[in-house]
């Protein structure tokens, strides 16, 4: 274990003249050369000369006193977020080589504030996975233990942070796809309130659940990134015209200001190492003055996972219907439309995506829609109401994952075990609430993460609570190696 710059530390170092963007980008490139072949965190990388040119421009801006908020900060972007200067594949053979004609809104906002985008990070195909193993470009490995998964679907975003190839990253979170990688790579992932960040340019998996989400090596850093990318967008009708305020340690909460609600029945389903780390951390917080309350979630514990997957797979089946072999890189050769579509989808989609499409079509089919899909939407309202009631009085605290990082290949052949990895994280997506995951312990050389779920637009509150936990654990800024 070693330490790397947090974004805040890096910007302070630039400001003081202790380092400059050219030196920093050179260090990042050294980390890439050392780690990337083994980890496979990126699908595509920007050319080195382009990165050095961008670093030189950033250095000039710092010297002239014209630095923007992310000037010289190296950022990785998940490869389901559109970029006009690098391919956007969504981790799928279906989109291999596809370069969009536009940038996603979040990418435009990063570039306007001086971020240097190093490349597009690996992911489970179309963001459908919890381990990072379902990419057409090969699995991503966990830098903390190369025999284990880094979590998914934002696997590359977590992994590149964990070995020092970027200072911050963007992922997308549909049911925990930023928070699971954060838990498994000792990084911080923040899923914002639904609508706070524009989804324009995001290749969709499940529109009503997913959010583009920041990742970094500290809670302050994810808030800084969120400050840049958040806000309304005329190209996304679901976006809201609100912006968070950056939280700093000086204006943050004190332990005695914290109220945590713990769904004890849910936590008890986690592995012993995870459970011990979780209760050890919340116990220390209680010792510092935080208030703990053990609660039930009105049935959310039992129904959240099946409701989530029913809704997500139905939306996925609808979204992926557009890939019919006529518009994107993988095309069918038959002149008959249906044969062309079948051929292209057979070639272009991986096994997990095919499985989810079939299940999504099934729950939407005549005779089953009421029994499955409509029932799931009703359960979603019950879960949302229970969560809104709970976060009105406290932050919901759970482990970020019920298990330690599994070994590569351990869960791919058992969909039920694979999907159960999301049991804690789907609560925030079903209710549209913000949630943060951060490391609380390194156990046997592997990270363990904690999740906090807060009220709508409560990102600053979550960051303040995370600041306290980071002070307690001392794990902000750690990287593998």
Curated annotation (Swiss-Prot):
The keyword Ligase applies. Keywords: ATP-binding, Ligase, Nucleotide-binding, Protein biosynthesis. GO terms for molecular function: ATP binding; glutaminyl-tRNA synthase (glutamine-hydrolyzing) activity. GO terms for biological process: translation. One of its GO terms (cellular component) is glutamyl-tRNA(Gln) amidotransferase complex. InterPro entries: Amidase, Amidase_CS, Amidase_dom, AS_sf, GatA. The active site is at 78 (charge relay system), 153 (charge relay system), 177 (acyl-ester intermediate). It is an enzyme of class 6 (ligase). Its EC number is 6.3.5.7. It catalyses: L-glutamyl-tRNA(Gln) + L-glutamine + ATP + H2O = L-glutaminyl-tRNA(Gln) + L-glutamate + ADP + phosphate + H(+). Pfam families: Amidase. Heterotrimer of A, B and C subunits. Belongs to the amidase family. GatA subfamily. PANTHER family: GLUTAMYL-TRNA(GLN) AMIDOTRANSFERASE SUBUNIT A, MITOCHONDRIAL, TRANSAMIDASE. Allows the formation of correctly charged Gln-tRNA(Gln) through the transamidation of misacylated Glu-tRNA(Gln) in organisms which lack glutaminyl-tRNA synthetase. The reaction takes place in the presence of glutamine and ATP through an activated gamma-phospho-Glu-tRNA(Gln). HAMAP family: GatA (MF_00120). This is Glutamyl-tRNA(Gln) amidotransferase subunit A.
């Amino acid at each position: 274990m070693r330490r790397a710059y947090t974004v805040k530390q890096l910007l302070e170092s630039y400001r003081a003249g202790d380092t400059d963007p050219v030196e920093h980008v050179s260090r990042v490139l050294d980390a890439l050369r050392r780690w990337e072949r083994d980890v496979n965190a990126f699908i595509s990388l920007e050319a080195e000369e382009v990165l050095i040119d961008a670093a030189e421009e950033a250095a000039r801006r710092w010297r002239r006193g014209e630095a923007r908020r992310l000037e010289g900060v190296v950022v990785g972007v998940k490869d389901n977020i559109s970029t006009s200067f690098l391919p956007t594949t969504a981790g799928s053979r279906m989109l291999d080589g596809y370069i969009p004609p536009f940038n996603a809104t979040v990418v435009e906002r990063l570039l306007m504030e001086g971020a240097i985008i190093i490349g597009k990070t690996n992911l489970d195909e179309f963001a459908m996975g919890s381990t990072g193993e379902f990419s057409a470009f090969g699995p991503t490995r966990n830098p903390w233990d190369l025999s284990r998964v880094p979590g998914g679907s934002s696997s590359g975003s977590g992994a590149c942070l964990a070995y020092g190839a970027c200072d911050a990253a963007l992922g997308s979170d549909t049911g925990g796809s930023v928070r699971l990688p954060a838990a498994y790579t000792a990084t911080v992932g923040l899923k914002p309130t639904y609508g706070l960040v524009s989804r324009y340019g995001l290749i969709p998996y499940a529109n009503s659940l997913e959010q583009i989400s920041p990742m970094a090596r500290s809670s302050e850093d994810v808030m800084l990134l969120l400050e840049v990318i958040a806000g309304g967008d005329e190209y996304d009708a679901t976006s809201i015209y609100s912006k968070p305020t950056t939280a700093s340690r000086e204006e943050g909460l004190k332990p005695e200001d914290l109220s945590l609600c713990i769904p004890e029945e849910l936590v008890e389903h986690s592995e012993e190492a995870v459970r011990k780390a979780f209760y050890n951390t919340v116990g220390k917080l209680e010792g510092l003055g935080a208030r703990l309350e053990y609660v039930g979630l009105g049935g959310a514990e039992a129904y959240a996972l099946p409701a989530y997957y029913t809704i997500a797979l139905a939306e996925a089946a609808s979204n992926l219907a557009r890939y019919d072999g006529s518009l994107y890189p993988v095309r069918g050769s038959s002149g008959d439309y249906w044969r062309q579509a079948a051929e292209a989808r057979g070639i272009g989609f991986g096994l997990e995506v095919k499985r989810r499409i079939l299940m999504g079509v099934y729950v939407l089919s005549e005779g089953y829609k009421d029994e499955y899909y409509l029932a799931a939407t009703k359960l979603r309202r019950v879960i949302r109401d229970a969560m809104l009631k709970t976060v009105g009085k406290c932050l919901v605290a759970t482990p970020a994952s019920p298990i330690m990082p599994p070994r590569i290949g351990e869960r791919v052949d058992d969909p039920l075990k694979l999907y159960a990895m999301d049991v804690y994280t789907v609560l925030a997506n079903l209710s549209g609430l913000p949630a943060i995951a951060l490391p609380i312990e390194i156990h046997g050389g592997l990270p363990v993460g904690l999740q906090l779920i807060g009220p709508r637009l409560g990102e600053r509150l979550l960051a303040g609570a995370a600041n306290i936990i980071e002070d307690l654990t001392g794990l902000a800024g750690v990287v593998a190696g």
